[in-house]
């Protein structure tokens, strides 16, 4: 996969230390199967155009503008110049405001990851100093930056020779867990916990990206390949039901019985291995 072009260029600042940096998305959707909308009768691609909701006439790109709705069919028109006039300093600067212990941000607040790197040789040293200092103190930096005309809170995490920038969801965007977890039974059966722990230890592995491969993506690629060859897509054979599946026909299952069977199955496979 070829390196992507930087999504954002600007400056990383800490106190009096500043260096030019570039930020690139850490994830990609370009390898995903994408579809076009076609006219089923002709096979031709369908295209869309913006039209005026009242006159019905097409609207050219240069005629488009932003508008804030203040009432029904009543908008405040904003030009590009208007929007640029309210740009913040964070449009081109990531000024690290504070530091927090690494790992102290709950995952639910993390949104989109970016790779942050020095953008020229002159800034390499300053960038390395900031990154190494955060690594040594085992902290992450908290800052803000404007992305897509919106100021976003971000956290900067030293990683390898670079820094990973995570955009953060704002506090009011994350629903309190207490709204959902209140009333859940706190006490658990000790034997049940021990049984689950045994299963966990058996299935413990080191992380690998292959663990989260997309089976739908693979199936789509195979379907498309079959279509290209003008063959009917092969149907996956239905998996044979196992003895365990036959035994578990009821929707109501005794948790301890299920756990005992799971542990016995894990131990049996361990001995066989």
Swiss-Prot record:
Transmembrane segments: none annotated. Belongs to the prokaryotic Ku family. PANTHER family: NON-HOMOLOGOUS END JOINING PROTEIN KU (PTHR41251:SF1). Residues 13-190 form the Ku domain. Keywords: DNA damage, DNA recombination, DNA repair, DNA-binding, Plasmid. It comes from Allorhizobium ampelinum (strain ATCC BAA-846 / DSM 112012 / S4). Residues 227-251 are annotated as: Disordered. With LigD forms a non-homologous end joining (NHEJ) DNA repair enzyme, which repairs dsDNA breaks with reduced fidelity. Binds linear dsDNA with 5'- and 3'- overhangs but not closed circular dsDNA nor ssDNA. Recruits and stimulates the ligase activity of LigD. One of its GO terms (biological process) is double-strand break repair via nonhomologous end joining. Pfam families: Ku. Disulfide bonds: none annotated. It comes from the Bacteria. Homodimer. Interacts with LigD. This is Non-homologous end joining protein Ku.
